[in-house]
Each structure stands twice: as structure tokens, then as C-alpha cells.
Amino acid sequence: MVAREGGPAPADAAQRIAELREQIRRHDYCYYVLDAPEISDAEYDRLMRELLDLEQSHPELVTADSPSQRVGGQPLAAFRAVSHRVPLLSLANAVDDQDLREFDRRARERADRPLTYVVEPKIDGLTVVLSYEEGRFIRAATRGDGLIGEDITENIKTVRAVPLRLKRDIKSLEVRGEAYLPKAAFARLNEEREEAGEAAFANPRNAAAGSLRQLDPKVTASRPLRAYFYNILHLEGADGVGEQVEALQMLEDLGLPVNPERRYCRTIDDVIDYCRYWTEHRHDLPYEIDGMVVKVNELDQYPLLGETAKSPRYAIAFKFPPEQAITRVRDITVKVGRTGVITPTAELEPVRLAGTTVSRATLHNEDIIRERDIHIGDYVVIQKAGDIIPEVLSVLKEKRTGEERPFFMPQTCPECHSPVSRLKGEAAIRCTSLACPAQAKEGLIHFASRDAMNIEGLGPAVVNLLWEAGLVRDPADLYDLTAEQVAPLERMGKKSAANLIAAIENSKSRGLAALIFALGIRLVGQTAAKTLARHFGSMDQLMKATTEELQAVSEIGPKMAESLQRWFAVPANRQMIDRLAEKGLQMETEKAGDAGVPQTFAGKTVVLTGTLTTLDRREAQRLLEERGAKVASSVSKKTSLVIAGEAAGSKLEKAKELNIPILSEADFLQLIDRV
């Protein structure tokens, strides 16, 4: 072979490229994972420049796992949705020692052998899931709603703490972790943004999330993100592990960063001591933490311990006591919500609290104001409940000067001037008008929200524009909009208008459960909406249901039944439902007649495993739940059925061991007539 002019022969280049990649990977690991660099920044830069020059001269030698591929590729048009192999549950919270002891007691009652624990700091960052095949990084996704996240592969490549190649070529590995921005990096980033005239990030978590959700990976690459990993979600081609401490060690041995502050605890007393230590020393860490994560160490006990609908019973998050600050109440304002509730808010002199600047705090309702004797002009102690929502905890009455003024809730709605009322047994004061514009606008915002009709681009600002232009007054009006009507509005234009109309059109297929939730009926949340859709099968049957029939449905109590009856009794609401039906929104569950969907899996606990080729996991779960199934994430003796897709792993093996019936994806589709 003839060498290219001015450069080494391809064979020599390939050898040198391999050497450089290995050196750079090792130095990345020492610097970003071990925090113990072996060479200077200048020497590191020299190695990287040499690699980039060689790869530019020999593009045929560039590979996806080369360190050069971290610099950031072409901007993305949008993030692709990714179905998670395993549902990513959130953790229940413990706020004191008693909660931890209660968690320990419940776990031991369900377990069939003694338990120990693993405890580590709960980093306040963005949850990410990494996938590796044959030891090579192939995909990264955000948590999303726990079932479906967003593909952030190109962005995660730029995080140098994340290995693009593992130290062993394991056939298949999926891990969960947390990406974060160190405190010092966060401070520098905000200084740069302020100098550039850009808005500063409120906290490191927002900065990490904003960095990883950049459509341009080069922006992500410019921000020094780090990550720690803590869960093996899927493993194939390697010996499994029996304990969480072994799982963490395996991750570390593979080259993935694992928190060095993790600790093995033999007893709940040891757990409590460690949580107390970090409660006092949390600010010593170079990153923000908002608590500690406590996990049962014995992985074989997880199926016995089980899960609730939202969280596992084998792990819990110990939340630190909220931080507090003192500031002054400059004013008290009120806002009308979508159900007419008028909520007071304290306008505060800005103060730093738990890493963010706080200028407002919720006062919840008039009773809270009276109980705490809060006046305009008072100095107050504020805290963040869960370090998230600011609230006024108490008043420093010794600081009063006599110039403070008491606050009284309005007797009429501040938006429409209709009378307000307070229902018996409730603290909330409500506007009594069904035509209140503030309620209607908040209702439109809720209707378009992600968990409801998921109309992208229809946030508060756009709703306000449409309202002020007289184009919408209720959700049905949205489906009469045209791009020609929307384009002339402020900050819209032809492209934004076309995108909005397309998003509104796409929302028609969201399904009955989403529509019921989107209507904003008081007390009817997502879970209740799904239950009602599954039980009645159609909007028409739901509207016809009597109070007794509603209360006969599991999870629907007297208050919710009464709320549903009241809402459907309003002629304007029924007329709006008719208009939505005319516009083509789904008013029935799929394949539902008057009797609803056949309850093929009624009373059965079903586990999905492997990769489904025809359906995504969320759709399969929806179809199962519509037909009466309870979908679980792990196989146990209580499992009735396992549906196995391609590359099904340990769950399938366990199902075979327990003699649990197994269906292929094709069998499942045939059973529900979806072939």
C-alpha cells in the first residue's frame, strides 16, 4: 500500500489511532470518573489533536466509539421517542427516622431472609438510561414518564464521564443513572450566560436537563456534565449479580462512574446514621443532592417485596429537611385556577434558598393566612417543601413595626367580578361563574397539557394570544382554528401556526382516557380517567351513568361521583362534548361497544419482557390494562402470564422456572384481534 502524502501508511495509522484511543479513554476515566488526572490539559489536548488529524486523513478508520465522536454532531430536528425495556419507577419518600424504620419493617415482613441495605447520595440531576451492545454504547434516553423517554444519544456522547466502550464486551447491558452539573461548573455557566445577556438557570438540575435536551449536541458538549450510575436494568452475556453492592462494583469494573460515597449498611440503624451524616455534610459535596437513596441489597428479594403503581417497595428516598430563609412579604396577590379556586400568593423580596432565588411563595388558602397571621409587610420564614415549592412557614412578629397590613380574600372574582363562594368542608374560595375567563384560559392550558391532549406548542402564552384575539373560548374551539387565523398573531408566523394546527389535529387520536382527564373535571385525575374509560367504554355511557353506577366503579368515591354528575349536568359542557365528537375526537375506547372492551385479562397480573416489534411497550401496556390486566414489572409467583418479545432475558427464564404461561407477541396480538 502507498502511504498518503505527508502521513503514515493506513496500517501504521490504524495502529496509532488504536493507541491514541486507548490512551484518551484511560485519561478520560482518570479525570472524569476517578477525579485523579495523570497528565496536564495541554498533553491531553495534544493527544486529541493527533487523533483528530489522523482520523481526518483516514476517515475509513473512524468508529462510533472513538473519543473524537464526543465533540457533537449535526443539530437534530427533534428528539425521537424511546420505549423503556423496564418501567422506570420513582421512589417513595421518607422524611424522618420513623419513616425509614417503617420501610425496614415492611420490607422484612415481605422478605423470606434477612435484609441489608446500600445507601448513596440522591443526586439532583436528570435520570438517563444507557444501552450497550457487545460492549459498545448504542443509545441513551431520558426517563420521560417512566415508560417512554426521549432519545438523547448524540448528547450523551459528549459527556466524557460516560464510556463509549466498556472495559468488557458484554453482549447487552442497560443501566440507569443520573447526569448532573457540578456546582462550580453551574456557577461558571450562569456567569457566561449573564455576560451573554441570556437568562441564568435556576438550579443545577435545570441546567443539566436543559443541556441534555439541546437539539444541537455541540451546545451539550460545551457544558461539563458528569454522571453516576446505580442500577442494572438489563444484563445479557455475563454472570448475573445477587446483590446491589455487586451490581455497583460490576458497573465500576466496566468503566462506568459509580458514586464513591455509597455505603453498605447491615442494619436500619446504620442507614439512619449515614443519612444523618449527609444531612449535616451535604454542602461539602461538589454537586447538589436532595436526599439519600436506600435500597435493599439482596436483589433476589425484589420480586417478593414488589412494587406499588408508582414506586418499588425495595427502595426509598430519604429527603433532607427543607432549608429555610428569612425575607419580607411585599404584597399578596391572587390567581384564579381552572376549577375556579382563588389561590393567594406571597410576593417576596428576592432571597436565595436551597440554591435558587425565590421571589414568590404559595399561601395555599385563606385559612393558612389566618392561622399563621400573615400580613403584607411581615418578615417571614420560608422553606421549600421537598426543596421544590416555596411556602411561608411562620411570621417573625417581633420584627413588626405597625405598618404591616392584614390581607383579605376578595369577595368577588378578580377576573370576572362574579361572587365567590366557599363550599362546606373546604378551605378553597371559588369563583361561581361558569363563564369566568380566567377559569376558561386555565382550562385550555390544562386541556393542551402533556398528560392530557398533549398539544405541543399550546402553552399559557399561546392560549392567551388566542383568547385575546377572540379565537377560542373552550376546548372545542381549538379544532376550528386554521393556520391563516393563527399566523398573524404576535410571535407566531406561518411555520409556527402550521405546527400548532398539526399538533391540534394529532391530538384527536389521544384516546378516551386522555380526553376525560383533559376536560378538567374536579377530582378526576389521570388514574381515575383511565378507570372510567376502561369501565364505561365510551363518553356517552359515562355521561349517562347515575351516581350509584359511578360509585360502583373501583377508585370512584362519592365526592368524585358527585363532581362528575355536576359537570355533565351543565348544558354548555354537554354541548362542548358534542362539538368535540363532531370534530373527530375519540369518544370510545378502541374496539369498545356499549359493553366496553372485552375483559380478556381480568384479574390477571401480566409481565412484558423483551423487545416488541409490532407495538411499543406503552401501547402494549395500554391494551392489557384496557382488557382488565394489572401490568407488573417483575416476575413472581403472583404473575399470571408473561408476554415475551425478542431478546427476552432473565424474566423469561424465571417464568419458565415458575411454570408461568408464556405468550409470544404474535400470540398476544391474535388473542386481542390485532393481527
Curated annotation (Swiss-Prot):
Q: Where is the BRCT domain?
A: 596-675
CDD domains tied to this protein: BRCT_DNA_ligase_like, LIGANc
| Record: residues binding NAD(+) | D41, A42, E43, Y44, D45, S90, L91, E120, R143, E178, K295, K319
Q: Name one GO biological process term.
A: DNA repair
Keywords, ordered alphabetically: DNA damage, DNA repair, DNA replication, Ligase, Magnesium, Manganese, Metal-binding, NAD, Zinc
User: A Pfam family for this UniProt protein?
Assistant: HHH_2
Protein's UniProt name: DNA ligase
**Gene that encodes it:** ligA
